[in-house]
Amino acid sequence: MYSTEKVLKDFRDVPLKEREKAIGSELVEREMLSKLPPLMRNMFVDAFLNPAREEQIKTDERTIMLKIFFAQLNISAVANHIITHKPSSHKALEALYNKSPVMFVDRYFYDCRAGDAIPDRLNAVVENVPHLIRKIGEEKAFIKVLIPGSGSAQDIIRILVNNPDIRHKTVVRCIDDELSAIKLGRKMAKKAGVSDNVVYVKDDLMRLDYQDTDLVLLVGIICPLPNIVSIKVVKKVVSYCRKGALVVFSAALQKMLIEDPVTCFIMDIAGWRLNYKTKKEVEEIAKKSGLAPRGSFQDPKNKYHQIIIGEVI
């Protein structure tokens, strides 16, 4: 194995031996390759082992045909949501969270390491954030939580349901630019009995007018962004906070790319391209955004995400 501090942009940077090992895994064969028509199977393997250069992706016939194939809803609900809706859409994340529905090749996405890391990251947030809210609550009668790019906000809904002692003093503002996410979130919050605590607003996370937030959850938002843009986004979120507030943000690590390059390859085809970072880079993003380190945690199974806790200084 090689250092995770080496700069790796995408699956092409993973050594050929590692890619050959990955494409030959039992899971890839059972839940992906064996289900593909012969032509698609051959294209899939060839495009993974002998990829087009980055500047040729848009015109590479294999990539184009594979994208058209995976865009079919009866083939994959996950890939369909990414391709036909938008990359990083809440619809794809909801499917990964719930491991449903199961179309032709979706079992692969739900069982692969990178796919399983998404609900595992959600569970890690649900497990680690309540004590932060309690800590803030020691000094404040009400805690104002902001979730930019919230999607349905499954994380905060579960946190409030699982921790009734903090529910009565927690007010949450969920911001998303997808109306479908807003509608789903409101429905889920109402069903869970926490709709009085959670307000959903359709808006742009970069154009908010808040200055008094106590806690921000920015989960999954900077994963596709270059470091310089990630800093800009986290800085903007910091501006919505009071001094001493806590910001929790996550970033996908290069470990995901190294250990599951096949899934990262499929994500590239679908247009959901992540910017895989090192732990050092994630820490630097926090520092340059005006945050003092106050801890971190990860998705426990595979540790594919670094989740930083920073204090606004």
Give short role names for the model-derived ranges.
Residues 2-65, 109-133, 140-143, 153-171, ...:
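Class I (Rossmann-like) S-adenosyl-L-methionine-dependent methyltransferase catalytic domain
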Residues 58-108:
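N-terminal, positively charged/glycine-rich alpha-helical extensions of SAM-dependent methyltransferases
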Residues 206-216:
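A short acidic, Gly/Pro-enriched loop at the edge of an enzyme's catalytic core
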Residues 217-221:
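A short beta-strand submotif of the Rossmann-like class I SAM-dependent methyltransferase core
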Residues 147:
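Class I SAM-dependent methyltransferase core
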Residues 236-243, 289:
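Conserved helix-to-beta-strand junction in the class I
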